Amino acid sequence: MSGYLITIGLETHVQLKTRTKMFCGCSLAFGTESNTNVCPVCLGYPGALPVMNREAVKLTVMSGLMLGCEINRVSTFDRKNYFYPDMSKDYQISQQAKPLCLGGGVTIQMPEGQKRIRINHIHLEEDAAKINHSARFSGVDFNRCGTPLMEIVSEPGLSSPEEAMAYLQSLKQILVYAGVSDCNLEEGNMRSDVNISVRPEGQEALGTKVEIKNMNTFKGIYAALEYEIARQLGAVSHGGVIVQETRRWEAELGETQPMRTKENAHDYRYFPEPDLVPIVLSAEQVEAWRALLPELPSMRRVRMMAEYGIPEYDAGVLADAKENADFFEAAARLCGQGQGKTVSNWFMTEIMRLLSETGKTITQCALTPEALAELVALVNGRAINGPTAKELLPELFNNGGMPGVLVHARGLGQVSDAGTLEAFVEQAIRENPKSVEDYKAGKKAAAGFLVGQVMKLSHGKAAPQQVGKLVTEKLAERV
């Protein structure tokens, strides 16, 4: 609706890739029986003291560095007080006064160009328990309670559902690249609270904010944003008033519904956590963690284009998933200079097809960069032809091994002996007189048909280039 501005901000909770919880040694194994990965600390027993997880601090700092944040050399924990069954000690350990990371941002690519979405801060906190509802009762599973989370709070700089999707997808890609989180949406490793407001054009002050809590699918976030924007615009355009509140997304109904009147920070009665000392980081420690960071996906895309001579589209697709880019680069380096485009062609066509058909990732299949490099070398050296290589690839993908071994064991080597090939060509011409007549009549495609017949006679082993040359020569003798 013209005449109004939409403002969106996101608070994204990301589960960090640690083996144990934030303030105790309990396992973070997913899918275990309810209330088995628990101890007095994460159950909130009186007198149980928290011990900070150093790995969680490291991963949060690495995330901040990847996102261009300023690292707070001294940060502190605070208690966020609230009463709800998912937090048995009645407070959550979080960071409010001095978070670990400040500023930074994510660059998104939109049809109209690039846009920088600024980040306000990143802080560490513990996750709450999970409440499971049934028809007869509600139960609380404390396995999740105490899971290390970092909350990435954007500035209210997004103006459409499309921008929100681009921001979240870019954020996920960067965090997965850095190895700080799996960002597995199905397991709840990446969840967002969405804040939306609308205001008339020309009005400086933001409109009344509505928050949609705990969204864990990109599809759901997009749909919730579309609905909530339409709801708010419909209300204000008819003289209605937007109430500051928290709402939830009901996917089955396709609408947001009220949960509670929105709390402000003072409602949580934040105060310093007395059982944890401040996090003090030296400059040397921050730089040591910076040295562990990989390239940003955007930088890797540009470098791969220059280093391997692959098209921008190929580089973009490969760089989108770190494991795909890692595999491609390993295979391209093994193949040697000038083979980047060949390796890219194999990955973008045959390998991507197999990944799509099986639903696997490149790390879940049995194909190795060494096997792909050897397959390319066998084709380049004319030990086998392209069709034979394509027949071998699914077996290498599913069962592993090296193509050279399979070629030797099955007698799949390419036939390049001139006498043998000439005999195949003569047989194909003899058995297909109509194709010869078509060629004489000017139908050059007939030569291609005869090449196919030779390949069939040789069970795909004939060297295609030599066959093509021989067929042309033999047909020329008959014109």
Question: What kind of region is each of these model predictions?
Answer:
Residues M1-E295, A306, E312, L334-G338, ...:
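Basic, nucleic-acid-interacting segments
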Residues I362-A373, G386-K456:
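Strongly charged, low-complexity linkers/loops
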Residues Q285-L292, M299, A330-Q337, L372-I384:
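Extended, non-catalytic structural segments that build the interaction scaffolds
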Residues G188-P200, Y268, M305-E329, G340-E357, ...:
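Core structural elements
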Residues K444-V479:
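Short, amphipathic C-terminal "tail helix"
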Residues I279-V280, A315, F327-A330, Q339-T342, ...:
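Extended hydrophobic-aromatic, low-complexity segments
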Residues K17, R199, A230, M348-S356, ...:
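Amphipathic alpha-helical core segments of compact helical bundles
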Residues G309, R333-V343, G381-I384, A441-A445:
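Structural motif
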